[in-house]
Amino acid sequence: MSHDADDKTYPYRKDDAELRRRLTPLQYEVTQHAATERAFTGEYTDKEDDGIYKCVVCDTPLFESGAKFHSGCGWPSYFKPLNGEVIDEKIDYSHGMVRVEVRCNHCGAHLGHVFEDGPRDKTGLRYCINSAALNFESRPEND
């Protein structure tokens, strides 16, 4: 699923050549062509440090570590984004399924998907996010 046919315009304009230079091949494929990293291989799947997870493309803060939980799915999981304005959701019909794709609302980078099987005592949602789409910024006490 490529973003090439999308009609939404995002505030941050990405230069493809610059992205190819700056991102790893996996980061590029995940964020620009909606690829999925293999389960249990991502850098942030088991990370428990206190901090903020940001978009690897535009550095927009997306998720707080306090919203992260162990879902057992093999990808970092969060029960809510930082706020309601940082995430764009779009119906995804790829691979013979109907899912809700999650993108950065600032640059349109593919992040992952959101499912309704998260912690019931929180939001009931599970934002299943590719580590390759994220950068982590630890809070000063973790340095």
From Swiss-Prot:
Annotated Gene Ontology cellular component terms: cytoplasm
Highest taxon listed in the record's lineage: Bacteria
E.C. no: 1.8.4.12
Cited SUPFAM superfamilies: Mss4-like
Domain MsrB: 16-139
Keyword check for Oxidoreductase: yes
Active site: C128
GO biological process, one term: protein repair
Cofactor binding note: Binds 1 zinc ion per subunit. The zinc ion is important for the structural integrity of the protein.
Binding site for Zn(2+): C55, C58, C104, C107
GO MF annotation list: peptide-methionine (R)-S-oxide reductase activity; zinc ion binding
Family of this protein: Belongs to the MsrB Met sulfoxide reductase family.
Name of this protein: Peptide methionine sulfoxide reductase MsrB
Annotated organism of origin: Burkholderia multivorans (strain ATCC 17616 / 249)
Gene it is expressed from: msrB
